[in-house]
Curated annotation (Swiss-Prot):
A single GO cellular-component term on record: cytoplasm
Gene: rlmM
Transmembrane segments: none
Cell compartments where the protein resides: Cytoplasm
Enzyme class: transferase
The protein's name: Ribosomal RNA large subunit methyltransferase M
Amino acid sequence: MTERDPIPTRHATRWLLQCRPGFGADLAAELAAWSSDAGVAGWPRVENDQGRVDFHSADGRPLPTPPALTFARQAWPVVADCPQLPERDRVGALLEALAPHLPEALAGVWLEHPDTNDGKALGRFCRKFRPHLERALRERGVALERAGAPRLHLWFADSRQVVAGLAPAGSGRPWPMGIPRLRLPRAAPSRSALKLEEAVGWLLTPVEREAALRPGMSAVDLGAAPGGWTWVLRQAGLHVTAVDNGPLAESLRADRAVRHLREDGFRYRPPHRVDWLVCDMVEQPHRVARLVRHWLVSGWCGRALFNLKLPMRRRWQCVAECRALVTGGSGELGWRSAQLYHDREEITVLAWRPAAGSRG
């Protein structure tokens, strides 16, 4: 890398990718599938208990930027590795390692760590460490909070072991560690509302949200009870048909724009086309995938936002199989997927008919 290179992705031979702890092997399998399809010579190293995968160039050549991967919360090119910072002057040693790579300005400084119980203690350390680091950066002439500048990532495996990277402006999820800070409104019927709120904020672009979630639009919520997803759609002004044999929250039962049908979500057929199908049913993922495809190819909905509950093993293979089921394997239907922070043993998927106008 040339001195003070602001675009490290051109030279990166290693990427650090973050995921939900316990899903590192699944992210590695997804990386292997991408690298094989793209002809990229690389190999992953998994830190499964930390929720981290390092992807290394196999031949020393720069790696291309990975696409938006389902299991990756965050991804950035590595510029420096500090395996043992000194106890007394961690800031000085870190800046010395970063010196050849620091640009004149940074959009932000993100101190990250494993999303685990042990990582919580590191989080407290990072909050104390951050102001000292930012002050030292300013003293070296690096402007902070500059829009459009690269973002500095520092991954702390512990208080002295750090991996540093620079991410281009606008890349990755717009939150440290890929974790949005969402609060559950008191009026929400269940915590599942946070899942849909995060999905809408990440899987749709701002332009798509404005165009596709307008007051007066229509949606069907399969497996709606107690109504967390229906509630989020109502906050956007959509009219919702909530399909579930279980009860809805009282506030939704009193809402004239919500129609509750006590029916089986797999048997329900809409009387007319709706703008959205949403589904968070606890069911076999392949069965849900076939149901969503049927809705889309039948023209019953323009877009679908749904969860797939994953098996304990071979989860990436399950995702790939479900994608092929939904899209037909030929790009006939659009697909965008992510394991969100509020997902657990599941992923969230946005699928659409091309005429619905989502980006590919």
